[in-house]
Amino acid sequence: MAHKKGASSSRNGRDSNAQRLGVKRFGGQVVLAGEIIVRQRGTHFHPGAGVGRGGDDTLFALVPGAVEFGTRRGRKVINIVAAGE
């Protein structure tokens, strides 16, 4: 088996684009319905009240209000608190 493939070949050339994951709206920030709160792989954060989860585990606001981070049963959850509360 040759370990050198020959002229005009390279084993380099792979540098994938960043996935731009992470928290997009932080605690206390006001969001509208449909705004993305967190882009994630897997459920690092779980959806709470007023928050939906997309097919790629993205969390988004279902109702307008302020973002609130908390825990429930040892899991990190994100809730939307209505402006009047």
Curated annotation (Swiss-Prot):
Q: Which NCBIfam families match?
A: L27
One GO biological process term is:
translation
Q: Where is the composition biased (Polar residues)?
A: 7-19
Q: Which Gene3D superfamilies match?
A: 2.40.50.100
SUPFAM superfamilies found in the cross-reference section: Ribosomal L27 protein-like (SSF110324)
Tell me the domain of life.
Bacteria
Record's keyword terms, sorted: Ribonucleoprotein, Ribosomal protein
Molecular function (GO) terms for this protein are: structural constituent of ribosome
InterPro entries xref list? Ribosomal_bL27, Ribosomal_bL27_CS
Q: In its keyword annotation, does this UniProt entry include Ribonucleoprotein? A: yes
An example of a Gene Ontology cellular component annotation for this protein is: cytosolic large ribosomal subunit
Q: Which organism is it from?
A: Kineococcus radiotolerans (strain ATCC BAA-149 / DSM 14245 / SRS30216)
Query: What are the cysteine partners in each disulfide bond?
Result: none
Query: What is the recorded name of this protein?
Result: Large ribosomal subunit protein bL27
Q: Which Pfam families match?
A: Ribosomal_L27
Region of interest (Disordered), ranges: 1-20
Give the family per the record: Belongs to the bacterial ribosomal protein bL27 family.
